[in-house]
Swiss-Prot record:
The gene is malT. It comes from Yersinia pestis. Pfam families: GerE, TPR_MalT. Belongs to the MalT family. This is HTH-type transcriptional regulator MalT. GO terms for biological process: positive regulation of carbohydrate metabolic process; positive regulation of DNA-templated transcription.
């Protein structure tokens, strides 16, 4: 819950001086990116902007306190202020901020600006007391904010110090409206107005001017003069002499003498006790002071001018002026030192009763009351955890003495989950083992349910570490004892079980477990796990060869991301990457490339090492197009990321795929041999991850002419793929087997492997996997088409593959271009008939397409001409070549290509 007073405009006080000369300057605020009110405490910064804001619509106000140095808290309140200003226009940004589903503050602000791009009219955001921010990450994000905010948005910052926001650059570019101490100091006219409002006996103009000069227009000093002059035996002139030359850091003695000592003991105790609160309402005042009429007392003190401000129009929330608040807290520590822990304890109870555990934690920490801190955590820690309040939880758990933490095993479990969520994976088991040992030594009982929750977390750690057997045992044992009410641990254990089956190649068992995980996670709003389960389902379906079903599952995942605003999570990149893989398989290369590029964009706010697999996909897209130079650029980027980084074998396998294909296309045996000497050779190949690594190895062995070794590898891969029903892997393996057989002149076995690959492709939809094999694949497909040896579906796919090879690779159509024809006609062995009666350029193109296996209609579509025109071209070229039918034309084209060294 957000504290309403932090988002409320301060109420405009009745007896304040209207700063007309400054309001005129502020009237042009909409013309600037930043309006900065920068001066020491007590010069009326907040009051001035409150006066100006009273006439503004579409304005959000955010009052900072020390706790706002947590980036997540800062983001949540800032977006909430924008939402109040826009009437809820930025709902997506609000959801992201509340669930902490963004990579960093800059990424969140980028989404905010996207939503504000269609906001019409001026928009203002006021951030008060910015000097309290000491977090460099927030400063950096606000510099990003100022660079990229929409033109119609003005940021207004109130600060005692010059904020680290690139102010000089804004000033040079005339994008800064700045008001400082000299402008905010009262002039003589304003001082006269002030005293007329505050004193029962008016001062002469000359007297008020002298008083103003003596305190250099410092508003707080004038307020203190007015307050002191109400006391017996005091005068405005005496007060001014005491205040002359003082500043905010030397006021304590004066405030004691002239303010605190002048109120009765009851009011003094009331002020000091209330000072522990950063903001207060009647319920909190009752908790701290025992006064049932606390709000009336506040209103009375406000009338006396005691630096108390209303924070909202409903007059429910109050706060002290920052200068007075600092003074009161210092006096409270001095005068009520023994009572102070009790006051913070009462404040914590008050905030808990209002439903603000984060504020309660602040006071429990201030009180040093670890028992209360423990009680708050036991009641609210998991809610804070699921709302990603990780920094706050870490602060709490650090403050708890370890013996107290282990006396409450659920907090020890929370500490381990916190490490897991902060990606400190190596610490998780250590924390759990340390806690279990401490509990055992202290004879603290741990029931079966809690032990099962420990086991579920350990299972997650084990599967992350690549230990599926250990993970399976831990997850299975956990599920035996976890009741349905402990849904989070059950979701984790079920997910791990499904992932174990996936890793073992037991896809038929893995899929329903992941479907069950998704259902449970959706039911209990654990959307991160629901998304993870959908990603796993998609990968399983791809491995089973059901790419269309995988595509549809991905659509569900995209919908979940949109609904729950998960766009900035790394799992979104995972989804885009596997979408790219499916599209690449279907030779929808433009879409595949777009998905991979979006994945890279998602990861722009994370470590660049995470971009490895998307860059590898972009390399594969270039390879499928035959663009080797562009592919090499991406491959080099992948190699640079891999250098000096530690990656899981799955990542390395995917990054190596385009490398080995590139070596095959370029004949780079040196690089291939070097890689083969160094690459990891897994002990098994019983899942699609390991199949991919061994397939890379087999391809390199073929490149190097080590055919016997490659055949052993491929035979085992095919056997495992058939046994485990890894249909997509079998499809890929058979294509590599085809390459092996073709290069070793075993044409019958090559044809058999190719036909089975085409049959499997009816299920997988594979196109690009065939295309990257290039000319050898094209020759075999043409032969199968000419022999009419394929069923209709396979025939259609073969023609589509040929078309893509012709379009993207070194192919027959390209060979019959003008340069090729010029060389052909000057070749000494060219047939005399062709030399004396050369074909036109269009006829050469048609011959190339006939040789590539295209039908007349397909040639017409390819060249975008009428079918009758194609028949005319064919009749003419037959006559010029001296052939009678299509088969003879293909043979003649084959002879010409052989003569030129292309086949």
């Amino acid at each position: 819950m957000l504290i309403p007073s932090k988002l409320s405009r301060p109420v405009r006080l009745q007896n304040t001086v209207v700063r007309d000369r400054l309001l005129v300057k502020l009237s042009s605020a909409a013309n600037y990116r930043l309006t900065l009110i920068n001066c020491p405490a007590g010069y009326g910064k907040t009051t001035l902007i409150a006066q100006w804001a009273a006439d503004q619509s579409n304005l959000g106000w955010y009052s900072l306190d020390e706790s706002d140095n947590q980036s997540e808290r800062f983001a949540t309140y800032l977006i909430a202020a924008i939402q109040l200003a826009t009437g809820g226009h930025c709902s997506k940004s609000e959801a992201l901020s509340q669930k902490h589903q963004y990579a960093n503050l800059s990424a969140l602000f980028s989404q905010l600006f996207i939503e504000l791009s269609n906001w019409d009219g001026p928009l203002y955001l006021v951030i008060d007391d910015y000097h309290l921010i000491t977090n460099d990450a927030i400063h950096e994000a606000m510099r990003f904010f100022l660079r990229h905010q929409p033109e119609n948005l003005t940021l207004i910052i109130l600060s005692r110090t010059l904020p680290s926001l690139g102010i000089a650059n804004l000033r040079v570019r005339d994008q800064l409206l700045e008001l400082g101490m000299q402008q905010l100091a009262f002039n003589h006219h304003e001082a006269q107005q002030f005293f007329e409002c505050r004193l029962s006996s008016p001062l002469e103009q000359g007297d008020s001017s002298r008083l103003c000069d003596e305190v250099e227009g410092w508003v707080t000093a004038l307020q203190l003069i007015a307050l002191s002059s109400r006391q017996p035996n005091s005068s405005a002139q005496k007060s001014a002499k005491r205040l002359a030359g003082l500043n905010a850091s030397h006021l304590s003695d004066y405030l004691v003498d002239e303010v605190l000592d002048q109120v009765d003991s009851k009011a003094r105790a009331f002020l000091l006790r209330c000072s522990v609160l950063r903001s207060m309402n009647d319920a909190l005042i009752v908790r701290l002071t025992g006064e049932d009429n606390g709000q009336q007392l506040l209103e009375e003190l406000e009338r006396q001018g005691l630096f108390i401000h209303r924070m909202d129009d409903s007059a429910e929330w109050f706060c002290f002026h920052p200068l007075f608040a600092t003074f009161l807290r210092q006096r409270c520590q001095w005068e009520l030192a023994l009572e102070l822990p009790e006051l913070h304890h009462a404040a914590a109870e008050g905030w808990m009763a209002l439903g603000y555990p984060a504020e309660a934690i602040h006071h429990a920490l201030a009180a040093g009351d670890v028992g209360m801190l423990r009680d708050i955590l036991l009641q609210h820690a998991w809610s804070l955890f699921h709302h990603s309040e990780l920094a706050l939880l870490e602060q709490c758990l650090t403050a708890l003495p370890y013996p107290l933490l282990v006396q409450n095993p659920e907090l020890a479990l929370l500490q381990a989950w916190l490490a897991q969520s902060q990606h400190r994976y190596s610490e998780v088991n250590t924390l759990l083992e340390q806690a279990e040992l401490a509990m055992q030594e202290r004879k603290i009982p741990v029931d079966e349910i809690l032990r099962a929750e420990f086991g579920a977390l350990r299972a997650q750690v084990a599967i992350n570490a690549g230990k599926p057997d250990e993970a399976e045992k831990l997850a299975t044992d956990a599920l035996k004892y976890l009741p349905m009410a402990h849904y989070y641990s059950r979701i984790v254990a079920t997910s791990v079980t499904g992932e174990v089956h996936h890793c073992k190649g037991e896809l038929a068992r893995a899929l329903p477990m992941m479907q069950q995980t998704e259902q449970m996670a959706r039911r209990h709003e654990a959307y991160h796990y629901a998304l993870w389960a959908l990603l796993q389902q998609s990968e399983i379906l791809i491995a089973q060869g059901f790419l269309q079903a995988a595509y549809e599952t991905q659509e569900k995942a995209f919908e979940l991301i949109r609904e729950q605003h998960l766009e900035q999570l790394p799992m979104h990149e995972f989804l885009l990457r596997i979408r790219s893989q499916v599209l690449w398989s279907w030779s929808r290369l433009d879409e595949a490339e777009e998905a991979a590029r979006k994945g890279v964009e998602i990861l722009a706010n994370y470590q660049p090492q995470q971009q490895l697999q998307c860059l590898a996909m972009l390399a594969k897209c270039s390879l499928a197009r035959g663009d080797l130079d562009n592919a090499n650029v991406y491959i080099q980027r992948c190699e640079a990321l891999q250098h000096g980084s530690q990656y899981h074998l799955d990542w390395i396998t995917n990054a190596d795929k385009p490398r080995v294909i590139h070596w095959q296309m370029t004949g780079d045996k040196v690089a291939a041999a070097s890689w083969l000497r160094q690459t990891e050779k897994p002990g098994m190949a019983d899942n699609h991850f390991l199949q991919g690594q061994w397939r890379n190895i087999a391809r390199v062995q073929i490149i190097l002419g080590r055919f016997d070794e490659a055949e052993v590898v491929l035979d085992e891969l095919n056997e495992n793929a058939r046994r485990l029903r890894l249909t997509s892997d079998l499809n890929r393996n058979l294509l590599l087997s085809n390459t092996l057989y073709w290069q070793t002149e075993r044409k019958g076995e090559a044809q058999k492997a190719l036909i089975e690959s085409l049959t499997l492709a009816n299920r997988t939809g594979f196109i690009s996997h065939f295309v990257i094999e290039g000319e050898a694949m094209a020759q075999q497909l043409r032969q199968l088409i000419q022999l009419n040896a394929l069923p209709e579906l396979e025939q259609h796919r073969a023609q589509r593959i040929l078309k893509d090879i012709n379009q993207h690779h070194r192919h027959k159509f390209a060979h019959f271009d003008e340069i090729f024809v010029d060389k052909l006609l000057t070749h000494p062995q060219v047939p005399e008939l062709i030399r004396t009666s050369p074909l036109t350029q269009r006829e050469w193109q048609v011959l190339g397409l006939i040789y590539s296996g295209y039908s007349n209609d397909q040639i017409a579509n390819e060249l975008d001409v009428a079918a009758t025109t194609i028949k005319t071209h064919i009749r003419n070229l037959y006559q010029k070549l001296g052939v009678a039918h299509r088969q003879e034309a293909v043979q003649q084209a084959q002879r010409l290509l052989q003569m030129m060294g292309y086949v």
